[in-house]
Amino acid sequence: CGFGGMERFTEAPTDFSPIDLYPDCKSVIAVGIALPKGLLRVEPRLLYGHFNEDVVHKVDEIVFSAAKIIEKEYDGICVPIPSDCPYEYWETETMTGKGLLSMKHVAVACGIGQIGKSSLLLNPEYGNRLTLGAILTNVDFESDPVCKNICIPECTKCLDSCPVLAIQD
């Protein structure tokens, strides 16, 4: 979990700023649950898919419950943001869509991790295994420190292991 004030979102991608969704937003809370390492080390990926779906629902339950607690305890207004859906649009053919926020950018702004060369969110403890959700609120919480970049400049592990060579240095 991490907290980020709106000053951290001045360079949010176009149409992905928290204030685009909730103009009175003063703070964003990012929540992440890590999948076990082993799920990324087995084939087929059916196990990963099964448990990732479960974790998505758990993250949604956490942000929903936490939003209600914050509204009660801090007399605030909260907008829980789900981990996966909904999308503004979804292109079935290309398997691409536009969500409500960039959860990776939210997590960076809230101090949970940094975006690596692979364009994945990297957390110092959990690597790229976090499933993320968020809460937008009008309560002005103190921001957590920004996470240090954990990418080793000379490292090319993600570039070398990309099966379609999509990652450029």
Segments and roles (model prediction):
Residues 12, 48-49, 54-169:
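Catalytic cores of enzyme domains
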